[in-house]
UniProtKB/Swiss-Prot annotation:
The chain crosses the membrane at residues 6-26, 58-78, 85-105. This is NADH-ubiquinone oxidoreductase chain 3. It is an enzyme of class 7 (translocase). It is found in: Mitochondrion membrane. It comes from Sarcophyton glaucum.
Amino acid sequence: MEFKGILILLIISGTLSILILGASYILGYKQPDMEKVSVYECGFDPFDNPGNPFSVRFFLIGILFLIFDLEISFLFPWAVTYMGLPLFGYWVVMLFLFILTLGLIYEWIEGGLEWEN
């Protein structure tokens, strides 16, 4: 059993985690204060029925944000090494930006960026 050390580490860390969680539950301050019962920054009431559906617009805007955030993370290394890249590297990035621009134009035309619909 060559992984005995890892097994012992997992058992010790699991036991310690359970002990700390239990101590926090037993010794923790349980009286709600004004910050705990107030409405969050997003405007949702913490004691409201959690079964209320979210608008699909929230998810659409979130997905669009992720797509364009990833675009920036892909473009940063290219921008750092731009002068050392051959012409092929330039055209690959231009194709990438063109495809993303087409996607943005499509979303714009379909009304995905308008909140009022």
